[in-house]
Structure formats: C-alpha cells, structure tokens
Amino acid sequence: VFIIAHQNLINPNLKKSISVSDSNNKKSDMGLISIPELIIGNITFENSSALVLQEDKNLFFDCFEVDGLIGSNLFRNSIIQIDAKSKTLRITNDEKLLQFNKLNKLKLKLIGNQKSPYMQIKIKNVVAAEEWVLFDTGMDNFYDLSKKHYDIFKKHNIFSDLGTGTGGQTIGAFGAEEGNKLHKCLLTDMKIGQILFKNIEVVTTNDDNSRIGASILKYSIVTLDFNGKKIYFDLFPENIDKTAIDLVQKSRGISMSIANNKIIVGVIWDEVLNSKITVGDEITNINGVNYENKDICEIITAKSIMKNNKPVEIIVKSKTGEYIKLSL
C-alpha cells in the first residue's frame, strides 16, 4: 500500500524498538529495521528503513491482505505522480519523463525524517485565511481539520459550526479514535493552487495537523517533486471547465466507528438523537443488510455509504437491548 505522509511500515520480527504515534495521536512501540533492497517496478531503492508493526496490531494488514506500507520517506530524492483514475503510480528522478501542468503548483515543506509533505491552502467563509496542511493519501476524507487549528479559526468565523459531539470516527494504524470532543463544520471555499472547491463538510481531528486526503485524487492527478519541493495538480477533463468543484454532501446525524469487531455509533451530531441512542451502541443493520455477524474485514474494506447523498436507514441496538430504527 502506498501512503504519502506515512513512513515505510512492514511486519517482520522486531529489531529495534521506538515509540511512534498515528493519525489519531495514539502511541505504540514499533520496531525499526533496514531493508537492503526494495524494488518497485524497475527501480531499486537501497538501504531504506522501515517501521515494524507488532503482531497483535495487524488488523489493517490482515484485512487488506498487504505486507506493508510504502511511505514518503522512500521518495525523498524522487518525483512521483499519482493518477487514481488510471490506477497508475509513476516514479522518476527526471521531470522531463512526466507530463503535468507546471502552472498549477504549490510549494512543499518536507517535515521530519519521513519527509512529510505540507502545502499551504487558502480557506474562506466570512473571513479568509491560509493554512499549512499535510498531504496524506492514507486519509480517505477530502479535508480533516486539526483541533488546534479549529480553535484558532473559530475566533475569526472561518467555518460555520454544524454540530459538536464526543466520540470517534477514524481508524489509525493502532486502532480506532477514542472519546474526543469533535466539531463538525462547513467551509464555504477552499483554494488549492488554482482549483476552487466549495461547500466542504469537515470534522476536527485529534491529530496536530490538518490534512488534505486521498479524496482529492477523484478530481486531479497529483505530482509531488520531493527534490524541487513542489506539488502540482492536473484536473481531470470533466473538471477543467468548472469555475468551482462543489463538494456539498448530505449531513448525517451520526458518524459510525468500529469497536470489538462491530459497527457502532461513533459520534452523535444531532442533539435530538441523544435521547434515543448513545455513543457505543451497536449498529446492526444498514439499508436492510444485517451486520451483526459480518466479518470485521468485510466491514473495514467496504466502501462507505455515508459519503454519498442518498438516504441511509439504520437499526441501532441500544444498551438496554432495544432496537431503534433511524433515517439519516
């Protein structure tokens, strides 16, 4: 699995133990090893390092049936191009071998040993602002807002608040996000280079950094030049003539999460629902499909039905054993 903003990560025996944190700031001891050769296509990377996930924390590896993650620290001297539509990853050290729009670019800051790529975006609601965000293809959402940045922006009406809840809705390398106070907001405008996005619903994250995630790959080819410290965006043909890309979506009254191999109520955003259900209640049925005995990997790898604009019907099993039907 290729994830920008992550370190190389594999699963053999531990060699040297260090402590790291994931996207939810959950910490774990991990091993550190050296890999003499790592071959991708016809390119050989020599003497690269990799973290080692412990045996009892391999749900991600098991469910997606992968042996590791390839992160940005491997490409510190490379140019990589991600074309999600054609499912193609291009790697080179010569920009002449790639075709991309050199006008629509942003500067990159490469932070830490893993060379995590940060770029500056422009955001606007009532007031305009700029924000340095991590480009993270391991995050499925379009945009995650760090709680630290939210506290700053709230004072200046950068976002419109849609709700507040306690719980979690994301899963990192070391497990699901735990009970944090979260905020759901609406951002009117976001500009990434020359591309304008509108109506972005965003939830705060416990991570220190705001992030642009893999969902941007639905709209654009992305080219990262780690040597030149630049990132380029090429809109797909169906988006080129649009003055803005509208990301409006149906706002749901809850967010889902996973605990004890079950789908649960992760966050309650609609205050009316607080009298009916609680965080941690099991979700047993979604749109007529029973999930009580579904395999955890089937749940984790399935495409989320909460991210489209179609109505969703769920059945929630309360702590008292009552089954409650809800329309979201």
Task: Report residues per predicted region.
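Pepsin/retropepsin-fold aspartyl endopeptidases
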Residues: 1-328
